[in-house]
Amino acid sequence: MACAVGAAPRAQNPQRTGEGAPTGLLMGVIIDPLDGQPVPNAEVKLGGAPPATPNPVVLADDEGKFVFMGLPKGIFTITATKPGYADGAYGRLRPMGLPQAITLGDGERLGDLKIPIWKFAAVTGRVTDEAGEPLIGVAVRALQRTIVAGKPKLAPGPTVTTDDRGIYRIPSLTPGEYAVVVPSTQASAPDSIIDLFLKQRMTAGASKPGESDISRDLSFSGATEQLLAIERHRGTRVGAQSFVSSGAGSRGAVAPSPSIGGGRIHVYPTQYHPAAPTAASAAILTVRSGEERVAIDIQLGLAATSLVSGTVKGPDGALMAALTLVPETDDLASDTGFETATTLSDAAGRFTFIGVPEGRYRLRAILAQVPVSGGGRRGAPPPPPQGLSAPSTPPVPVLGGFTLWATQSIAVGASDINDLAVNLRAGFRIGGRSEFVGALAQPAPDVVRRMSATFDPADARSLVSSIIGRGQFDERANLSSYQLLPGRYYVRVNNPPVGWVLKSATLNGRDVSNVPLPLDADVTALVLTFTDRPSTLSGQVQNATGGSDPSATVLVFPTDPGGWTDYGDFPRRLRAIRVDRNGQFQTANLPGGDYLLIAIPDESSANWQDPRVLRTLARLATAITLGDGETRSATLKTSAVPR
């Protein structure tokens, strides 16, 4: 491999030149990549075209052909969609792969474009009980295996229900890797809470002075769907509670009905194909374009369960909160929403989980509230005393609302648990100020107010609410947040002023922009530094004979293996860049640091973020150091990925 330093070309936007109408043309055909045959009647869309460009969406003809005419010079993309197929794009060489840009010169006419689209796959099988009898109307779900923050995860996919033979069929699967599951969550809630919830739904909110608005109070705790599921399926009464087995994360779907025998409730716990109680032990199926996998059967078995009861208290006493139980060791499915059991505490803080099988669990309790519009909720700073103005250099503002949380491990055996104490604590806030360092004029107050921040968990877990995970800037560019759960976070800035990019996030003299910020107490002194000198990395990819390689994808990742995991959902230092049709690539705004670069066939890049893959690629990659605000270029040769 070679790595040459030089100037980086700049991307061009579509524009008209000269006096006449533009005459550029893009023409091609939609194909099935398995056999190369044309696919007729797909919808084809042109991206990057100016608003005046005629017909940016066309329908391919019966031979799969399409054409866009009257185009100015510029950079374009082409995508294709058709029922029964995964979306395709020019330059996409694998399902869900990166598209490729097309650089069109003034008056240039390109007529050899091929757009692949892949047929959906399907999975079918039968769900039976312990006696081999079919289970009817039961939710079955596909979960796609992905790499998130450097670790394998299962992402929720389509849900179907079994027919009167217990047979299911999950269509419309993008080719890839999947687990198949019959999810089952034992959801319960106090009748007093359900009655109040239903009454308020009919009267559009709290109906008496001082009465709690259940929907408002629980909307940021994930409990509204739980109450709706219990109402929808008319749950079984157990004491002063209503209880239902529901297909977790599947609106309107149900799990097999529980039974009561020997004084204990028996339920069908979540089960993965072929006979796995957890996602970590599930079989992973690989489905290819157009393939239908059959006999993916799942047999369920009843499990005896126990009740888990106790009291929730917050800093000011007993309160109503949402509680969940998840298996303690099943990290692969930690974000699928497949809780073993959920419940709510009543106004006195009392709660009961119903239908909990034996095992070890993590109990999580949450109560989060965010003001609908500004003003005085818990945690908001008080106004200055009457007759006094605010200080000229006010402290970092604090957003209203609050987040109370608890998490603890519990072991459930054959006997009920009756006296569990759950003590909620307040979450933590992130605050700080911003500095704009560069030759450009300082951004105006109304501009910096339009910035926002995202607090990205290092392990990419879902936050209790996306709203709580957002931060705001005031007119002085001071950052404030809602209360967050403890953990490790990256601070990502959205919509910075034009010409400025985030350079660093410093806390106590340490740059935490590229390492997760541990949040175990309020942070008030974060300094976000913006620069008007963004870095740029560009170059050329060649094949084995020295010609340009348009089939390559360039990967950029840190030299330090510590940066290959726990980098959140929006990593700054890992990039996959699809080269253009001339084998050229470019990316901007990489933080300064030491990187590895490698070009590989795009077909081989599906799981490139797996640390095991990166470890292999690191031995073949080119090392490069990128300084703050530096422009570098590199010439790479495509490397085959070792099996």
Question: Which residues does each predicted region cover?
Answer:
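Long luminal/extracellular ectodomains of secretory-pathway precursor proteins
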Residues: M1-R643
